[in-house]
């Protein structure tokens, strides 16, 4: 597990930029292979139970996903950085009729590459017990 020690502001901003660019290329441009080769390190630890470790497993999984869901899109709501960690809070939809999922993705960056990933995914419900949004 990574340290949450404070990093240099310039490093944190560079990590946030790197993760945002990776996400845009992989999930909105639907280029997971290109994104993985450009932004993921040679050792990639995956904590999502549906995706194996390694960059090849990542892009194989998402190439198939985008063939099945060609209108899939994400909207990044927040980007937070802490040391070598970058956190994205986003809305993910498979198509324009989908209510979507609220996702929190956590990435660990090392030497300018993404080397580890965690996520938490929650369906956006049809009805809510309150008037707040998930974002």
Regions found by a protein language model. Give the residues of each.
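C-terminal and inter-domain tail/linker signature
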Residues: 1-135
């Amino acid at each position: 597990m990574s340290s949450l020690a404070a990093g240099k502001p310039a490093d944190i901003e560079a990590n946030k930029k790197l993760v945002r660019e990776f996400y845009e290329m992989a999930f909105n441009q639907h280029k997971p292979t290109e994104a993985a080769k450009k932004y993921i390190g040679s050792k990639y630890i995956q904590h999502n139970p549906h995706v194996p470790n390694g960059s090849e497993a990542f892009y194989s999984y998402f190439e198939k996903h985008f063939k099945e869901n060609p209108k899939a899109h994400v909207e990044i709501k927040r980007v937070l950085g802490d040391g070598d960690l970058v956190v994205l809070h986003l809305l993910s939809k498979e198509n324009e009729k989908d209510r979507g999922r609220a996702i929190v993705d956590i990435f660990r960056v090392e030497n300018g590459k993404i080397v580890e990933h965690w996520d938490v995914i929650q369906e956006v419900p049809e009805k809510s017990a309150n008037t707040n949004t998930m974002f």
